[in-house]
């Protein structure tokens, strides 16, 4: 399994806070999943990620949206199962354990909003990428709904509380 951390333009206004959060998230991800499995889709504003974490493979998020950064990352990593992490949200062991990682795509929710973690298995990658193509300017939850409506692929929605 690979980890894709997605940075996008909405995070740029709190850049220092996001970089500090990334340092904390990175330690936990590295401990749980290993250093060779971490990728980041970044905008131009977050180029210092390269200097702070030289072992992370970077992917350019040219449009600067969450879904486009996710799309670019998934296209690059489509030969593996992917754990998606929102760079603006805290990653914790509790959250990690609540995301079911099996045959179905899954998303972690906090009430009706995305909680910053999602899992996309390799087997459903092609269809999820197609769902993202239809939802570049929307929320990631819309891509999951499109996956279900357009391709008949169910997904698991788990909740923090």
Swiss-Prot record:
Annotated coiled-coil segments of the chain: 8-33
Swiss-Prot/TrEMBL keywords: Coiled coil
Protein name: Uncharacterized protein aq_255
Organismal lineage: Bacteria, Pseudomonadati, Aquificota, Aquificia, Aquificales
């Amino acid at each position: 399994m690979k980890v894709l951390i997605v940075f996008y333009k909405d995070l740029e206004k709190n850049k220092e806070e996001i970089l500090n959060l990334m340092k904390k998230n990175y330690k936990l991800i590295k401990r749980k999943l290993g250093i060779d499995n971490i990728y980041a889709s970044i905008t131009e504003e977050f180029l210092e990620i390269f200097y702070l974490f030289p072992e992370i493979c970077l992917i350019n998020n040219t449009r600067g949206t969450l879904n486009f950064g996710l799309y670019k990352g998934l296209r690059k990593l489509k030969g593996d199962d992917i754990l998606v992490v929102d760079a603006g949200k805290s990653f914790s062991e509790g959250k990690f354990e609540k995301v079911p990682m099996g045959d179905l795509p899954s998303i972690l929710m906090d009430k009706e909003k995305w909680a910053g973690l999602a899992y996309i298995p390799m087997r459903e990658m092609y269809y999820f990428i197609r769902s993202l193509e239809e939802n570049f300017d929307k929320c990631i939850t819309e891509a999951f709904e499109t996956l279900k409506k357009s391709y008949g692929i169910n997904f698991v929605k788990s909740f923090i509380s």
